[in-house]
Each structure stands twice: as structure tokens, then as C-alpha cells.
């Protein structure tokens, strides 16, 4: 089944939709605080994307574009996408919604970085993500994984 990924608006309706995820989800995946901050800052651009079934938001993620000057992961150095807080409501899991969100992120044709949470490593592996060589200074206790578009490889860290 094909799902349409929509760019979510920063408004109080989206805030109400996000409350369903907090009710069922894990605190570390909560986007309520992120959305509240964006509403109060009156931001126009939203990093939030989601999939609706009918009138209900059932899957969502945040996408942040990182500038080339901050790239410590990809060769050649370039701008990349960071996926945060991808979540599908429990009753809609294993129906291809998470895959649809990741495939949407890949359409930007930029490398993608994320840090898997809550027993999701198998999902990310199926989506073509691989672990990077851990660097204690760069990764700060995270275990990032990445997806490489054609022509991109892992940036090799140099010893200081």
C-alpha cells in the first residue's frame, strides 16, 4: 500500500495529534515539547512530517537538514539529513508506514544519519542503514547509523 507523507503544519491541531503519541509512546520520542517551542517561537518552517489515515495522524518523524560545514560523517563532506523521533502508533506498526517515512527522507538524495531507539535496529538495517565507526568525541555516547546515497562513503576520522 502506498502512503502519502505530508509536511506537518506548526499549529494547535498538530499539537493535539502529537498528544496521542505521548499517550502511547515513549518519553524520549515525544515531540510535544519540540512542537510547543516552535509554536511559541512562531516558526513558519516545520521539521515535522507524518502520515494520516483518514483524519488521524498515525506516523511521524522530524527531519533536520545539517549544513555541510558540520558534516563529520560523509565523504565527500556535504549537507545531510538527520532523522529524529520516527514513530508509528502501536496499532499501525508493521504496515509499511515507517518504511514510507524513511523512503520519503531518501527522496532528498542526501545522506541520512539517525540514532536508533527502542529496539529499532532491525528496522533500520532493513532500510539500508549501517553503523559508522564510533568516535567518542563526535558521537557523544550515541550509536549513529547512516544511509549513503550513490557515490557517498563514510568519512574517515583522523587521529589528532
Per-region residue spans from a language model:
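Accessory recognition modules or surfaces
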Residues: 95-99, 142-150
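Conserved acyl-donor/pantetheine-binding loop and adjacent beta-alpha core of acyl/acetyltransferases
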Residues: 26-85, 93, 136-144
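Conserved active-site alpha-helix within GNAT-family acetyltransferase domains
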Residues: 117-142
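Residue-level recognition of the GNAT/N-acetyltransferase active site
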Residues: 84, 89, 117
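Conserved GNAT acetyl-CoA-binding A-motif
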Residues: 102, 107-119
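Acidic, metal-coordinating catalytic segment for phosphate/diphosphate chemistry
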Residues: 158
Amino acid at each position: 500500500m502506498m502512503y502519502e507523507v505530508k509536511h506537518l503544519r506548526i499549529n494547535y491541531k498538530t499539537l493535539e495529534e502529537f498528544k496521542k503519541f505521548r499517550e502511547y509512546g515513549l518519553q524520549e520520542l515525544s515531540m510535544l515539547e519540540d512542537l510547543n517551542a516552535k509554536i511559541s517561537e512562531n516558526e513558519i518552517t516545520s521539521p515535522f512530517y507524518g502520515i494520516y489515515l483518514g483524519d488521524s495522524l498515525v506516523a511521524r518523524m522530524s527531519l533536520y537538514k545539517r549544513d555541510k560545514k558540520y558534516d563529520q560523517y560523509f565523504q565527500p563532506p556535504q549537507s545531510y539529513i538527520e532523522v529524529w523521533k520516527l514513530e508509528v502508533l502501536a496499532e499501525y506498526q508493521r504496515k509499511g508506514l515507517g518504511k514510507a517515512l524513511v523512503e520519503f527522507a531518501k527522496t532528498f538524495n542526501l545522506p541520512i544519519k539517525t540514532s536508533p531507539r527502542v529496539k529499532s535496529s532491525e528496522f533500520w538495517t532493513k532500510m539500508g542503514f549501517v553503523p559508522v565507526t564510533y568516535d567518542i568525541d563526535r558521537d557523544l555516547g550515541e550509536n549513529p547509523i547512516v544511509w549513503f546515497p550513490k557515490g557517498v562513503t563514510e568519512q574517515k576520522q583522523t587521529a589528532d
